[in-house]
């Protein structure tokens, strides 16, 4: 089922010492715009503001300068931009290039859980097996760097009710992270949304580890 829903790629075997992969899914768009370090994906959408930050590292823990992070997610209406004619083509899509420190950082809003399309063979399989069509909320990532294996993965919140029953079996233990609640006074400087946040926001910290190709 995970191969039918994420038709461009099944989950790959985990590289030794690297971050686990997960499903690509059918909603990735090539050519996403550059997302500066500290940039924002939420735009004018309402929702829980989240700062996603971390590093892109090699298996020894050294930062990988120039690595690219291609990120995308659903809008608050549970639709990807390619499913929703009311969204811009690259809504909630961006590509960030890290510097010599390997650090990435961007803001967005918390993605929501959604149902996979249930028409066609996927729906038939779900009906035959008695499974629901829900996926837990998640952020999608493709992480690339010269000389390293491409990583296609997802990162999930630890409090999602569908975490243990993902209909495409994409959840891996090391891909589950806590959305850490923060006060507005603690929002960092130097970000696109600095000085614009009122109320609580969340922090998600996650390091990606790539292995040599």
Task: Explain the meaning of each model-derived region.
Residues 110-153:
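A short, solvent-exposed loop/turn motif at the edges and junctions
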Residues 103-109:
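Exposed aromatic-hydrophobic patches
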Residues 37-42, 161-213:
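Extracellular beta-sheet/turn segments enriched in Thr/Pro/Gly and aliphatic residues
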């Amino acid at each position: 089922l995970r191969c039918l829903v994420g038709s461009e790629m099944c989950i790959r075997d985990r590289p030794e010492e690297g971050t686990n992969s997960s499903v690509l899914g059918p909603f990735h768009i090539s050519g996403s715009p550059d997302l500066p370090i500290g940039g924002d994906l939420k735009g004018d959408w309402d929702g829980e503001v989240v700062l996603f930050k971390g590093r892109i590292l090699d298996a020894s823990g050294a930062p990988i300068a120039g690595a690219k992070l291609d990120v995308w997610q659903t809008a608050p209406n549970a639709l990807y931009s390619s499913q929703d004619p009311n969204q811009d083509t690259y809504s909630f899509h961006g590509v960030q290039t890290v510097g010599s420190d390997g650090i990435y950082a961007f803001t967005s809003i918390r993605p929501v859980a959604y149902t996979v399309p249930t028409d066609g063979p996927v729906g038939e399989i779900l009906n035959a097996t008695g499974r629901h069509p829900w996926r837990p909320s998640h952020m999608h990532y493709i992480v690339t760097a010269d000389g390293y294996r491409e990583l296609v993965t997802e990162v999930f919140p630890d409090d999602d009710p569908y975490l243990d029953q993902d209909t495409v079996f994409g959840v891996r233990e090391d891909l589950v992270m806590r959305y850490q609640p923060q006060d507005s006074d603690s929002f960092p400087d130097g970000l696109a949304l600095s000085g614009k946040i009122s109320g609580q926001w969340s922090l998600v910290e996650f390091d990606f580890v790539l292995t040599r190709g």
